[in-house]
Amino acid sequence: MPREVRERQMMDAAVATFGQQGYRAASMDEIAELAGVSKPLVYLYLNSKEELFTACIRREADALLAAVRDGVVEPGLAPDQRLWAGLTAFFAHTAQHPDAWSVLHRQARTHGEKFAAEVAGMREELVSFVTGLLREAARTTPASPDLADLGDRDVVGVAQALVGAAEAMAGWANETPDVTAKEAASTLMNFAWTGLGGLLDGERWPAGNSPVPRR
């Protein structure tokens, strides 16, 4: 069997085991058995449990990022449709690969700084991608000021909020029966785009420029 095929089988088995049992509880024996190979062969290919887990994080992070980017490649989409397409692709991927999402969203973030840093890199790329979508929305919305006028921190802050909300909703959607990717994306769009649309039209929350009222 070609090396890349055997390695993919081992990685698939590792993602399933790590995702369902957690990093600490998962054993190399179980991973080898699920992959249909010997444990020495797993070590030969991927050296240690830590390196295997790191490889799983990187592979699944790359796959998620690719799914989101591929979701918005259709030319001529309006800004809201591009964001909708990206969110739908995000939720579809996390729903279709629940073990991978568990590895990225739960296991990697709670089992050491090295693993958390790998996921943080993926998140930074997502935030950067969403930031680009927001800037594009500003440029193509005639009534709005350029979002750059708000300052980089404001734009990135909105992108951070959207990514964080999407991450939280993916966990909820995967644990709630019968929630589809389109339903999850629609819920987030209904929440986010109404407010974002006002921002693009130059509207601001008035209380943001005045003292918080006391009760």
Regions found by a protein language model. Give the residues of each.
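Helix-turn-helix
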Residues: 9, 13, 17-51, 55
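Hydrophobic alpha-helical connector segments
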Residues: 55, 70-99, 143, 152, ...
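Alpha-helical DNA-contacting segments of helix-turn-helix folds
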Residues: 53-60, 67, 104
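Short secondary-structure transition hinges
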Residues: 51, 85, 92-131, 148-154, ...
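Amphipathic C-terminal alpha-helical segment
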Residues: 92-96, 100, 132, 159-179, ...
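Amphipathic alpha-helical packing segments from all-alpha helical-bundle domains
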Residues: 62-66, 113-142, 156-160, 183-197
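N-terminal intrinsically disordered/low-complexity leader segments
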Residues: 1-5, 138-150, 200-215
